[in-house]
Every structure is written in C-alpha cells, then in structure tokens.
C-alpha cells in the first residue's frame, strides 16, 4: 500500500520533523510498530505557512488494514519536542471490494 501525508505549518514558529512512529494494523497479524529518525530519509525543516508531503508505503498480508501514528517535531525557537498526531486511515485493496 502507498500513502501520502501532507503537513502544513500553521504556527508562527519554524518546526522540524525528527522522528516517526507508526502502528500498522491488519486482520492476520498483531499490530506492528515502526519507529525511526525522519521520514523517507528526511528531517524536513518547515517554515511558517510552508507545506511538505511525504509519500511512502507499507506491506501487509491482508486485503485490509489501517495505520495511525505520529511524527515527533521540534520547535526551533524553544527546542521543545511535540508529537503531531496522524489519525487512523484505512488501507483497502480496492480490487477486492468489487
């Protein structure tokens, strides 16, 4: 499955993506957890009003699944980390629904 995530910085601060955390759920396995630095090899710095997109993918063995997680960001002004939640989204094999 491929997915596209868009982040828009609507704050007045410069932020940077530093880590990712994903929960990948499918019907045939326990939830898989993936964590690591950056996203697709990038630790993007996002200025006020700027938008970035990440395209990636995951392999699951079932026809349907779901993902949720968060990106850990850092505020460049305060050096404080915060989590940017990514709500659950479905992974559906459209061909199996026909």
Which role fits each region the language model picked out?
Residues 12-33:
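Short acidic, flexible loop segments centered on an aromatic residue
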């Amino acid at each position: 499955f491929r997915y596209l995530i868009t982040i828009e910085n609507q704050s007045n601060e410069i932020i940077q993506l530093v880590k990712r955390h994903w929960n990948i759920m499918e019907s045939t396995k326990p939830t898989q957890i993936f964590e690591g630095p950056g996203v697709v090899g990038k630790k993007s710095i996002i200025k006020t009003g700027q938008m970035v997109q990440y395209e990636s993918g995951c392999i699951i063995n079932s026809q349907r699944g779901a993902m949720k997680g968060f990106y850990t960001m850092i505020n460049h002004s305060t050096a404080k980390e915060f989590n940017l939640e990514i709500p659950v989204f479905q992974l559906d094999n459209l061909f199996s629904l026909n």
